[in-house]
């Protein structure tokens, strides 16, 4: 498998995790958030959120900066991620319309 296809499939796998997907959507709506803010918003433990953030970091979906006291996470490529989320939304709507 070529590198580009592999990376695309890896991104699909990451976003296939409902917690990761919710976190990415949340970060798309906010400039930057701490793990505790993300955990509160998605209803998961900080430990679980931190684990998922690590996977999203490895997948180059998110990045973080430290302000001394805490890490703040943001999307690495916000406009591209928002485009993917928008395309997924349109696909789901189209697929739902076909079933009817």
Q: Which sequence ranges carry the predicted segments?
A:
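Amphipathic alpha-helical dimerization/coiled-coil segments
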Residues: 1-8, 29, 76-100
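N-terminal helix-turn-helix DNA-binding core of bacterial DNA-binding proteins
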Residues: 6-48, 69-80
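Short, hydrophobic-biased segments on the C-terminal half of alpha helices
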Residues: 24, 53-54
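Intrinsic structural disorder/low-complexity segments
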Residues: 50-51, 93
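Beta-hairpin "wing" of winged helix-turn-helix
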Residues: 57-68, 74
